[in-house]
A protein has these predicted regions:
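Glycine-rich phosphate/pyrophosphate-binding loop and the adjoining helix
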Residues: 151-192
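N-terminal beta1-alpha1-beta2 submodule of the flavodoxin-like/Rossmannoid cofactor-binding fold
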Residues: 2-119, 177-192
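Short, intrinsically disordered/low-complexity patches at protein termini
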Residues: 112, 117-118, 126-128, 169-170
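A short, structured active-site edge motif that brings together acidic residues
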Residues: 49-55, 127-129, 164-167
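Short, glycine-/small-residue-rich phosphate/pyrophosphate-handling segment
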Residues: 123-163
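Short, charged/polar "capping" segments at the starts of alpha-helices
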Residues: 29, 142-147, 170-172
C-alpha cells in the first residue's frame, strides 16, 4: 500500500522537471510543429498546440475579467488552463512562427488573454513571469519585433533562438527545417 507521503513525494519529483512546450503555428506539420515534437521527444515535455485550441481573442465584453477572472465570457475555451500549466511549470518553451515580420496572430491572442488570467492579482502575474522561458522563433526576417513581443513574458531579456530556414538552405513553407542535422543540434544546444 502506498502512503500519501510517497504519492506526494513522487508528484513533487515529477513536477520538479515539468516542461511545457507551446506551439503557436496553425500548420499541423510545419516547422514549428515539428520543432515542438522534436523538443518533446528529447525532453518528455507536454506539447500544447495553442492555435488548434480555438482560443477566443479578447473582446465582446466589458472587461469583466479585470474585476473577477471567472467573469471573462471566454473562460470555457481553455486559455486559463494553458496559463496555469505555464505558471506551474519549471520551464516553458514557446515555438512561434513569423507571419509578415511579426509573431503569428495566435501569439497576440495568447498575450491579450493573459489580462483575464492575471486579473488584478499581481502575485499570479509575478509567478507567471518568474517561470523560466525559452523562445524559438521560426523567422527569416525581423528579429526586433519578436524581441519586443517576447519581452513581456519574462523578467529581463528573453532567451530566443532564431531559426531561419534560409540559413540552412531551406524554404520555410516546405516545413522541413528539422530534417537538417545542424538544426537539430542547434535546438538541442539551445534547450540544454
Amino acid at each position: 500500500m502506498v502512503k500519501l507521503s510517497q504519492v506526494e513525494s513522487d508528484h513533487r519529483r515529477k513536477a520538479e522537471n515539468m516542461r511545457v512546450i507551446i506551439n503557436f503555428s496553425p500548420r499541423k506539420n510545419g516547422n514549428c510543429g515539428r520543432t515542438a515534437k522534436l523538443i518533446a521527444d528529447m525532453t518528455g515535455a507536454e506539447v500544447i498546440d495553442f492555435a488548434a485550441l480555438g482560443i477566443s481573442p479578447c473582446g465582446k465584453c466589458d472587461y469583466e475579467c479585470f474585476k473577477k477572472t471567472e467573469n471573462c465570457p471566454h473562460t470555457s475555451d481553455g486559455a486559463n488552463e494553458v496559463y496555469r500549466k505555464i505558471t506551474e511549470s519549471d520551464e516553458t518553451i514557446f515555438v512561434v512562427p513569423d507571419f509578415c515580420d511579426f509573431p503569428c496572430s495566435a501569439w497576440f491572442v495568447f498575450s491579450e488573454r493573459q489580462c483575464g488570467y492575471f486579473g488584478t492579482d499581481g502575485k499570479i502575474a509575478e509567478k507567471f513571469n518568474a517561470v523560466p522561458k525559452k523562445f524559438i522563433a521560426i523567422t527569416n526576417t525581423n528579429k526586433e519585433n519578436f524581441v519586443r513581443a517576447f519581452g513581456d513574458q519574462v523578467n529581463g531579456e528573453p532567451d530566443i533562438l532564431f531559426l531561419a530556414a534560409k540559413d540552412f538552405g531551406k524554404i520555410s513553407l516546405n516545413g522541413d527545417l528539422c530534417d537538417d542535422p545542424r538544426v537539430i543540434k542547434t535546438i538541442k544546444d539551445f534547450i540544454g
